[in-house]
Amino acid sequence: MNTLRAAIVPGLIAGVVSIFASWFWMGFVFHRYQRATPETWRPEGPRNYALSSLVRVLSAIAISVLYVLVARFHVSFFADGMVGALRFAAAIWIALAAPVAIEAAIYVRMHSMVVLGQVIDWLTTAVLACAVTFVWTAA
């Protein structure tokens, strides 16, 4: 099975689940901190939610594809079962998502708890993408 075929379904599953996880983190747990910097945020609406959901699903698919590529080449640190999948999720998160959120907060006025929420939110997406992909490809 080729890499994209092996990763697309688990990536879609993880992406859809991560939309709800994102709602939990950013829409429920950390949303109240956005009020500290109201001038930073655009008005929210259905279009915003649809676009951010699309970004979330595509990101989960991309992470799944990268994980399948790395696991298939038996990179020992990342090919060690579920633990390896979680290591890969952490590496992707540390390399991409966390620095983007943290660096944006340096230049854009955001409450520190919103930044923490974004970082946790993207860690959740990376973990879901890698864990679901591992379970899917191991079956």
What would you call each of these model-derived segments?
Residues 1-139:
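Juxtamembrane/disordered regions of integral membrane proteins
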